[in-house]
Amino acid sequence: MSSESISENYVVKDMGLAEWGRREIRMAEAEMPGLMAIREEYRGTKPLAGARITGSLHMTIQTAVLIETLAELGADLRWASCNIYSTQDHAAAAIAATGVPVFAYKGETLEEYWEYTFKALAYEEGPQLIVDDGGDATLLIHRGVERERAYARTGKVPEISHDNKELSIVDALLNRQLLVDAEYWQRMATGLLGVSEETTTGVHRLYHMARNGELLFPAFNVNDSVTKSKFDNLYGCRESLIDGIKRATDVMIAGKKCVVLGYGDVGKGCAQAFKGMGALVSVTEVDPICALQAAMEGFAVVDMDEACQWGDIFVTTTGNVDVITRSHMDVMKNEAIVCNIGHFDSEIQVDALYDDPSLTVHEVKPQVDQIEWPDGKRITVLAKGRLVNLGCATGHPSFVMSNSFTNQVLAQIELWQNSDRYENKVYVLPKQLDEKVARLHLANLGVKLTRMTEKQADYLGVPVDGPYKPEHYRY
């Protein structure tokens, strides 16, 4: 990176990319009607005026539109990506050029990634709100508080975890800060009004902390808004999965045996995508309900111990760990392709490949590696087991991200304006806001909504203007 791409207020790949980024941001705005409508609705009131917001979310063109929406509503912002491969460098440069501190470039090391997350949180008086994706900013604060409390009790700097490489990096960073300021994270947590979390994996973390009484501030589960999970997770993945695989490999998908591991909303989108391309699609599942859904859609539901021997393309969608193991990959056919579209790189045992000296790693191009076994067999691993759609392509289309990000903005407004209503628990946005997000996107698609009569509304026992479904309705 050139020196002009690093300053106290930003770290990006190349500030010379800013104008390119600006042109793409303008294009994306035309496809993000929800965010643009929110800007117009709140233009005069600035409902986030004075709010200090930290973002830990993929630094893409679509995220740039989110950032500028939050800024137009009055917020101060600092931003980092939530994945080492997901940043679009021209988007980061365009945002840095506006004066918003942003710390992100495609291909960060893990040490840089956590340092940039730390920088995004480093307001002089601390952040008041967090926009999180995967929960890493939230994790850093909670783990920091935990270590500060341990230090206060024992007088000893806590040992660095060796459970995995990434946690070791996090703990080393926290220990350095501990020796500078032993109450840094506790002060930050006290000043936080809440977090809005974007994705399934991060939401799981939040509910786990809330159940254990460990959550330090209120949280909004944006992921489970219907206009997020049933659109971003399904329709977004249905398009961006194929985009990532195609850009990475140029492989013909028609006729291939494609195995989708997991059949939640993300898995459903991936299975539909492969089916639409003419692939022979199989699904693995642990949940009998999801397995039955897959079977009723015409997909073969199989066991991975068998599928690993004949599949051509594998994608993990579960949010779990060790879904594709080293033993699975040992028996895969020559030239099989392995990738992940869950948030973290834990679904595929990639370290068992990259750390094995008996295997040879051939980098075809960035984020595309062929792993060669001693007998000459090769499999292709995309994005080193991280998000294939963002590591090997540019993520979901702008329109579907407008759904998700409009929910994020509404959650941030709610936390900022009504923080006294919320305890240290996990909340979801009310149904009427979910329906509002959907309404904001209808005209862009030429949708004409039917309006019920008063008689019809009375018959169903719902308001004419909604909400139309009970909270437990599954869509």
Curated annotation (Swiss-Prot):
One of its GO terms (cellular component) is cytosol. Its cofactor is NAD(+). This is Adenosylhomocysteinase. SUPFAM superfamilies: Formate/glycerate dehydrogenase catalytic domain-like, NAD(P)-binding Rossmann-fold domains. It comes from the Bacteria. It comes from Syntrophotalea carbinolica (strain DSM 2380 / NBRC 103641 / GraBd1) (Pelobacter carbinolicus). May play a key role in the regulation of the intracellular concentration of adenosylhomocysteine. InterPro entries: Adenosylhomocyst_ase-like_sf, Adenosylhomocysteinase-like, Ado_hCys_hydrolase_NAD-bd, NAD(P)-bd_dom_sf, S-Ado-L-homoCys_hydrolase_CS. HAMAP family: AdoHcyase. Its main location: cytoplasm. Its EC number is 3.13.2.1. NCBIfam families: ahcY, PRK05476.2-3. It holds the Pfam family AdoHcyase. GO terms for biological process: L-homocysteine biosynthetic process; one-carbon metabolic process; S-adenosylmethionine cycle. The keyword Iron does not apply. Substrate binds at residues 60, 133, 198, 228, 232. GO terms for molecular function: adenosylhomocysteinase activity. It catalyses: S-adenosyl-L-homocysteine + H2O = L-homocysteine + adenosine. NAD(+) binds at residues 199-201, 233, 262-267, 285, 320, 341-343, 389. Pathway: Amino-acid biosynthesis; L-homocysteine biosynthesis; L-homocysteine from S-adenosyl-L-homocysteine: step 1/1. Binds 1 NAD(+) per subunit. It is found in: Cytoplasm. Belongs to the adenosylhomocysteinase family. Coiled coil: none annotated. Keywords: Cytoplasm, Hydrolase, NAD, One-carbon metabolism.
